[in-house]
Regions:
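A structured beta-alpha segment of the ubiquitous adenosine-cofactor-binding alpha/beta core
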Residues: 1-32
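Active-site-adjacent "lid/gating" segments in soluble enzymes
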Residues: 21-112
Length: 112
């Protein structure tokens, strides 16, 4: 892994907060080996807070965000999930846009 990191442009990880640190692969540790590395960390509900260490999946995000309620059955008002992984897909789109912006910034500054 370290050999790959030295030559990598981008690293994307979506472990629960603290996992990469326990593996010795924190952002700081990897940047020390490759200052140009773009380090993308995706977590379900952020790095801190009451849910930070919880496992989070698309249906959970749909429920917590109120999205399932927006799709509720009109008669029973029972929440319904969208039948696609909308939160996962949206996260991927935003992450890709962030990587593109970070690569552009790196070309100007030399740092990831």
């Amino acid at each position: 892994m370290r050999k790959l990191i030295r030559r990598a442009d981008v690293l994307v990880q979506n472990f629960r907060p603290g996992t990469m640190e326990r593996l010795g692969l924190s952002e700081a540790a990897l940047r020390a080996e490759n200052p140009r590395l773009i380090y993308v960390s995706i977590s379900g509900v952020g790095e801190r807070g009451p849910y930070a260490k919880k496992r989070v999946y698309d249906p959970i995000i749909q429920g917590l965000s109120g999205f399932a309620d927006l799709q509720a059955d009109p008669e029973t008002r029972r929440p319904r999930m969208i039948r696609t992984i909308v939160a996962d897909k949206t996260t991927a789109i935003f992450a890709a846009q962030a990587v593109t912006a970070a690569l552009f910034a790196r070309e100007r500054t030399g740092e990831g």
